[in-house]
């Protein structure tokens, strides 16, 4: 991912304002509600029968926290996303057989949640920078599939 110094500074500054645990829980919850076929990977999480059940599910929240912390780790290694996500790419490809399109969809949910949480601070320029990052992360996670 090619980011300017200004974009990197914006990402770093805005990320510091984000409650990562809440954002991760909300992003994964939204993914499961908006794209219900993604639930197939989480059937063992218990009740996913409605939007409120998904959004209140403790296991969804815990996994969302895990996901967003991996994303945050990627923010520290923007120049080596493929290396940063290599083991997760292998896991999701070889063992979990996740559709690589789901990574892009999750990235969309992360951007939506950031817009919601950051409000007016999430300017169009900031969104453009984060869109580059989530696309880069999705590509890195899908790398093993190629």
Curated annotation (Swiss-Prot):
UniProt keyword annotation of Zinc-finger present: no
Sequence positions bearing N6-acetyllysine: 82, 144
InterPro entries assigned: Globin, Globin-like_sf, Globin/Proto, Hemoglobin_b, Hemoglobin_oxygen_transport
Expression (tissue specificity): Red blood cells.
UniProt organism field: Microtus xanthognathus (Yellow-cheeked vole)
Residues in Globin domain copies: 2-146
Full protein name: Hemoglobin subunit beta
GO MF term set: haptoglobin binding; heme binding; hemoglobin alpha binding; metal ion binding; organic acid binding; oxygen binding; oxygen carrier activity; peroxidase activity
Task performed by this protein: Involved in oxygen transport from the lung to the various peripheral tissues.
CDD domains documented for this protein: Hb-beta-like (cd08925)
S-nitrosocysteine: modified positions: 93
UniProt keyword Cell membrane present: no
Positions of post-translational N-acetylvaline modification: 1
One GO CC term on file: hemoglobin complex
Alphabetic keyword roster: Acetylation, Heme, Iron, Metal-binding, Oxygen transport, S-nitrosylation, Transport
TM region(s), chain numbering: none
